[in-house]
């Protein structure tokens, strides 16, 4: 078994369209002459996404990461929050303006509105009328409950590109699960792979993977949606389930287990790249 893609666009799975290359099939591309490097410009060029307007309803990791990437490539990203439901990255370290928030939302503009009040909703809809992209990674059903789901937003902006990301997707028996990267590592199988093959529970990890991965997948599909729109395809809605972004990175593991059941085991400090692989005590005092 292999993953059938990382996302759905307008409820259609976007998967692989071509076979995998054979060994050495594209070797000539690597052995050929390198592409010439253009001479440096005397004046700095505009950033590639300059002129695009993005409305960012992101919280925590995925949506916030996607918006930051688009902003740093020149898009005008407006981050929408409310005092009732601020981006939890603001407060996770015990303050309204923390280093983690300043880092994750750099290059953006901030905007506050009460999305549950009719006036606040109308103000946000006015923003959307002039937007190219909307990003959100709220719990399943939140945007629809606020009257700001894709079906609502496309009424005021038919050419809108919207990207949504939920932990387990927006449909199915697990769609109501809420959480972020660390809560997904267990159900996605990553914690088990990181464990030692000794029967003890997985040790856990402070890494917020796959939040940043899923955020980058969202950014790629946002740009793909823009390309499709510019070619006459109109607006579209992409959904990226975080769990599928994680499983997509484990494709080789899933394929191996499918071909050789029972062959995949927790890796601990083992690595297919070399042996020994780990942290070892060396001669001397506190030398490793």
Predicted segments with their positions:
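N-terminal helix-loop segment corresponding to the beta1-alpha1 unit
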Residues: 18, 22-237, 257, 261-266
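Glycine-rich beta-alpha junction loops
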Residues: 84, 167-169, 242-247, 284-286
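Alpha-helical interface/anchor segments and their boundary "cap" residues
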Residues: 18, 260-288
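A glycine-rich dinucleotide-binding beta-alpha-beta segment and adjacent secondary-structure elements
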Residues: 1-17
């Amino acid at each position: 078994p292999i993953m059938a893609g990382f996302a759905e666009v307008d409820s259609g799975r976007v998967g692989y369209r071509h076979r995998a290359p054979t060994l050495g099939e594209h070797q000539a591309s690597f052995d050929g002459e390198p592409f010439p490097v253009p001479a440096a410009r005397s004046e700095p060029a505009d950033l590639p996404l300059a002129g695009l307007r993005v409305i960012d309803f992101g919280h925590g990791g995925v949506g916030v990461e996607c918006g930051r990437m688009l902003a740093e490539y020149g898009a005008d990203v407006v981050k929408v929050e409310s005092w009732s439901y601020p981006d939890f990255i603001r407060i996770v370290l015990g303050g309204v303006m923390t280093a983690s928030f300043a880092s994750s939302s750099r290059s953006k503009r901030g905007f506050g509105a009460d999305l549950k009040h009719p006036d606040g909703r109308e103000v946000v809809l006015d923003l959307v009328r002039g937007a190219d992209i909307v990003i959100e990674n709220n719990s399943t059903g939140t945007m629809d409950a606020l009257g700001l789901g894709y079906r609502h937003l496309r009424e005021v902006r038919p050419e809108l590109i919207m990207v949504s990301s939920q932990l387990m997707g927006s449909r199915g028996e697990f769609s109501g699960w809420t959480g972020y990267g660390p809560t997904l590592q267990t159900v996605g199988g990553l914690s088990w792979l990181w464990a030692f093959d000794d029967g003890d529970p997985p040790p856990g990890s402070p890494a917020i993977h796959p939040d940043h991965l899923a955020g980058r997948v969202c950014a790629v599909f946002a740009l793909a949606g823009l390309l499709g729109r510019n070619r006459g395809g109109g607006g579209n809605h992409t959904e990226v389930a975080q769990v599928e972004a994680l499983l997509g990175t484990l494709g080789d593991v899933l394929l191996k287990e499918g071909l050789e059941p029972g062959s995949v085991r927790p890796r601990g400090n083992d690595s297919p790249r070399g042996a020994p692989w780990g942290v070892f005590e060396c001669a001397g005092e506190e030398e490793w």
